Every structure is written in C-alpha cells, then in structure tokens.
UniProtKB/Swiss-Prot annotation:
Lineage: Bacteria, Pseudomonadati, Pseudomonadota, Betaproteobacteria, Burkholderiales
Taxonomy, superkingdom: Bacteria
GO molecular function, one term: hydrolase activity
Protein name listed in UniProt: UPF0173 metal-dependent hydrolase RALTA_A1748
Record-linked NCBIfam families: PRK00685.1
Keywords in alphabetical order: Hydrolase
Organism, as annotated: Cupriavidus taiwanensis (strain DSM 17343 / BCRC 17206 / CCUG 44338 / CIP 107171 / LMG 19424 / R1)
Pfam family, one: Lactamase_B_2
InterPro entries tied to this protein: Metallo-B-lactamas, RibonucZ/Hydroxyglut_hydro, UPF0173, UPF0173_UPF0282_UlaG_hydrolase
Protein family membership: Belongs to the UPF0173 family.
C-alpha cells in the first residue's frame, strides 16, 4: 500500500526522475600545450600528475618518476617535465615523495605540503628551507597571488612515514613525515580538482565534496593500502559526486590490483560522473 502511494505521488510530482546521464568525458589527447582557457591534466603513473593551469602555471604532484614502473620512459628523465612552477607532495611515502628533492634542485620550484612533511624535508637536508612552503591541514594558500590557483589541503585516511637510507651511516631509517593530505586545486577559471593522494574511504568525503564541489577527482583505486574499486565507487557515486573521475594508484605492484574496469563496473552505468582512463603520459584537457 505504501509503495503504491509513493509511486502515485512520484507520478504526480515528477519527483522520482531517472538519474541524470553521465557527464560526457573529455578524450585523452597527445601531450602538448593546453588550449587557451583550458587546463591540462597529465597523469604519469601511480599518483604522479602534472597540471598545466589555464594561466600557464605548471603544478607537479607526487613526482615519483625515475623508478616508477608505470611512468612512460620519456618522462623518467626529470627535465622532460619542462617548466615546473610548484611541487605538491601529499605524504612522505617513497612512491609519492619520490623525486621531489631532485626535481626541486633541478627547477628551483617551491615545495608545498599541508601536512607537516616540510619540516622533515628541511631537517634531513632533502630540500633547502628556502624552497619549502608549509601550511596547515585544511589551510588554503594562493602561491601565485589572488588571481592564480588556490590550493587547500584536505584530509586523507592514510599514513606518512619517511623512510630513507642515511648517507652518513648507510642504514635505513624511518622518520615522522607529517600527516597525509589531499589537495583541492581551484584553477583560474574556477575548475576544481581534488587530487586525493593515498586514502581509504571516510565519511567526511561527503562534507569535502559539498564545501569544495570538485569538478574532477583523481582517486586511488588499487586497494591494499588505499581504496579499492568498490570503495572508490562509493566515494565518487555517493559521497563526492564530481563531474569527472580519473582512477590512479593501481597496478604498480601485485598488491594494488584494482583496475579501472572494476571501478567502472562498481560505479554503475547510471553514475553521474564521467570516468576518464588515460594511459600514463596521455593528457586530458578540461
């Protein structure tokens, strides 16, 4: 009886419409300069990402490149990245911190981290203090001034140990690496990208999505140390609800076995987000 009444009410009010069709996903294209007024997102395997903003600023996130099995050979030499204006690091694990010290030396770009990693980078002599820019988790910075991209550090459900070999002793050491974070990057044209770094599923993804309204999420799907395909689908479909999603952090080790196909299947055919699956080294313009 209650079901029949609800069906009648839906018919009268039009309140039970079918889900909106998925957003049309941009097609990956060959690397090059982004079109005027657009942003270019270039995924390079695992979490390594280069974003070229509509204003021409180049932001590199989690640059694990030279030993990354998924990075195209052409990008395993750091000069291939070209101009770099800013380096963002989500946390201290080697597959994210990666080549940050070498890239900072090569480009003289500032290194930003919103989770406390910067102090360790300086104290261990990995990055000069003059190049390290610290800001708090949930804080917002505008590195290029008020008309440039705006970057906010948000929560990630993960860990952040910094492991390295001490050159003085030759011994492996583990140091505190701050807290893991993700980044909401609002570009000059208002387009918002959430690079989630490494994270498990957490309920406040809904709140972050409601506050910042990201157009695009770069979301880990590999499983083992991050969300797998099922959890990532819940995050995108039920909590964040972005326009587009690019799966990252998968198939770089036997443990991170999730696939884009599993992610898309878990998301379902009626999900509102368009899923984009570029190959490492393919750019997507927005």
């Amino acid at each position: 009886m209650r079901l029949a009444a609800l069906t009648t009410l839906c018919a009268l009010l039009g309140a039970c419409a079918a889900p909106a069709p998925p957003a049309a996903a941009p097609r990956p294209v060959a690397p090059g300069q982004p079109a005027a007024g657009k942003a270019e997102v270039l995924w390079l395997g695992q979490a390594a990402t280069r974003i070229t903003t509509p204003g021409g600023k180049v932001i590199v996130i989690d640059p694990w490149l030279t030993s990354n099995p998924k990075t195209p050979p052409g990008f395993r030499q750091l000069p291939a990245l070209g101009k770099v204006d800013l380096i963002l690091v989500t946390h201290a694990h080697n597959d994210h911190l990666g080549d940050t010290p070498a890239l900072a030396r090569l480009t003289n770009a500032p290194v930003y981290n919103g989770g406390g990693l910067g102090r360790a980078l300086v104290s261990l002599g990995l990055v000069p203090e003059a190049q390290v820019q610290r800001f708090g988790k949930s804080g917002t910075v505008m590195p290029f001034g008020p008309s440039g991209p705006k970057i906010t550090a948000v929560h990630a459900e993960h860990s952040s140990e910094l492991s390295l070999k001490n050159p003085a002793t030759g011994k492996d050491e583990t140091h505190f690496g701050g807290e893991p974070v993700g980044y909401i990057i609002e570009l000059e044209n208002g387009f918002r990208i959430w690079h989630m770094g490494d994270t498990g599923l957490f309920g406040d993804m809904r709140m972050i999505g409601e506050i910042y309204k990201p157009d695009l999420v770069l979301i880990p799907i590999g499983g083992y140390s991050t969300m797998g395909p099922q959890e990532a689908a819940i995050a995108v479909r039920d909590l964040i609800r972005p326009r587009f999603a690019i799966p990252i952090h998968y198939q770089t080790s036997p443990q991170a076995s999730g696939t884009p196909e599993e992610f898309k299947a878990a998301l379902g055919a009626n999900a509102a987000a368009g899923v984009i699956v570029p190959q490492p080294g393919e750019k997507v313009d927005f």
